[in-house]
């Protein structure tokens, strides 16, 4: 459909033929990634600072256009102005691999008679088309991967199944932020292994680095339309672990000067849009703390930063605008099995922003969030991550729990607004 919208009258016949071909060969994560060129461009300005398959949603984050801000009109002096480019970016919360998450995936694999140890596809079946629907999808890989023969470990020092990296690629994620308080749970070698496994799966990693040279190269992904999107990130802590002085560059931290310098480097290297991620906040708090608020003010005041998103609190935090730019203070988890005394940790959001090109650069013209929820694992009751709205619509899952998740997520997303008003321009899907 996007192709048809951009082709003139002269190309109608060719367009119709292409449309038939597209219908005959539906897009997949692999196809999309083949069209998404990943560019890593050196820039001298970068600095190094001291849960049975579930329902498939029928409405994958399609946001109505009638209430979005109209773009400026084309210059009337141009008879045939070039088509405006757009890019949709999807971000999701923590992939936090507690041992019961693996146990659920192992149960699915055994039940289906599979040879592999784990089957995460069943757990995320309802989320896959949503991830694939975006031009650029970004996950947060919270913890490092183990080696093939290493003993897996869960909280508090994680070593997750290495098979997850390949699965992340198959889901349709194009990049993962990897900076977190667990980044070096398995030391520098675990950090390197995690980045390398993601790279082999066709997924870029952001926020951790295998060498000083890698840190100096902004991560920029180029879409099929040629839109260059830079991603930078940083974490608040390493959980008391320390890197040796000669490896201090291996993890990006969340101080504003560092993140702004990386954003400027990405813009200098050609990025049209720069997304800044941070990992921080108070765990299980639905509101941002003073550090988050101060950091966001600094980041959004920089012309190099176009949008800020975050995770770590393990519960959903507000979405708002600061200095005229969208900020997602916390997306909650994408999957986890936290202590059940924290029921909101079994909920999260995926957020989707559409950037449209104007004569003054790219700006957000559509913004939406999609509430998600999943169950506590027990043998015979495997985890299923469900988009809340479509699950309610289709009558799948625990209705009472879904209704509560829906209400609590809406309250959290709009938590900074007076009287719980909905954030202007933000849609729920």
Where are these regions (language model features)?
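Acidic, metal/ion-coordinating pockets
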Residues: 3-11, 18-30, 35-38, 43, ...
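Low-complexity, intrinsically disordered segments with a bias for serine/threonine
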Residues: 47-49
């Amino acid at each position: 459909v996007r192709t048809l919208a951009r082709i003139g009258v002269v190309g109608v016949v060719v367009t119709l033929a292409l449309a038939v071909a597209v219908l005959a060969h539906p897009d997949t994560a692999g196809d999309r990634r083949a069209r998404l060129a990943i560019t890593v461009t050196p820039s001298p300005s970068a600095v190094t600072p001291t849960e049975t398959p579930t329902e498939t949603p029928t409405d994958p984050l399609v946001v109505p256009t009638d209430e979005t801000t109209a773009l400026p009109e084309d210059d009337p002096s141009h008879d045939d102005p070039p088509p405006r480019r757009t890019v949709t970016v999807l971000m999701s919360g923590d992939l936090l691999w507690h041992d019961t998450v693996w146990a659920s995936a192992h149960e699915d694999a055994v039940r289906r008679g599979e040879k592999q140890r784990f089957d995460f596809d069943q757990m995320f079946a309802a989320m896959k088309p949503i991830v694939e629907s975006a031009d650029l999808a970004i996950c947060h890989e919270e913890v490092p991967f183990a080696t093939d023969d290493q003993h897996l470990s869960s909280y508090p020092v994680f070593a997750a199944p290495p098979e997850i990296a390949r699965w992340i690629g198959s889901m349709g994620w194009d990049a993962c932020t990897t900076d977190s308080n667990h980044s070096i749970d398995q030391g520098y070698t675990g950090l390197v292994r995690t980045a390398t496994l993601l790279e082999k799966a066709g997924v870029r990693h952001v926020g951790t680095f295998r060498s000083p040279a890698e840190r100096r190269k902004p991560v920029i992904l180029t879409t099929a339309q040629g839109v260059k999107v830079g991603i930078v990130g940083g974490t608040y802590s390493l959980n008391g672990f320390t890197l040796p002085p000669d490896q201090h560059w291996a993890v990006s931290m969340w101080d504003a000067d560092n993140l702004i310098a990386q954003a400027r480097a990405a813009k200098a290297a050609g990025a049209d849009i720069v997304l800044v991620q941070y990992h921080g906040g108070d765990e299980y708090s639905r509101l941002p703390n003073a550090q988050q608020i101060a950091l966001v003010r600094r980041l959004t005041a920089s012309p190099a930063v176009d949008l800020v998103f975050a995770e770590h609190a393990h519960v959903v935090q507000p979405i708002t605008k600061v200095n005229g730019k969208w900020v997602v203070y916390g997306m909650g988890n994408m999957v986890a099995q936290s202590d059940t005394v924290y029921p909101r940790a079994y909920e999260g959001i995926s957020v989707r922003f559409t950037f449209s090109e104007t004569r003054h650069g790219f700006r957000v013209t559509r913004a939406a969030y999609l509430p998600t929820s999943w169950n506590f694992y027990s043998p015979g009751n495997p985890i299923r991550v469900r988009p809340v709205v479509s699950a309610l619509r289709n009558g799948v899952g625990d209705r009472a729990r879904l209704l509560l998740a829906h209400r609590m997520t809406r309250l959290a997303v709009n938590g900074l607004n007076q009287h719980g008003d909905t954030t202007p321009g933000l849609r729920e899907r």
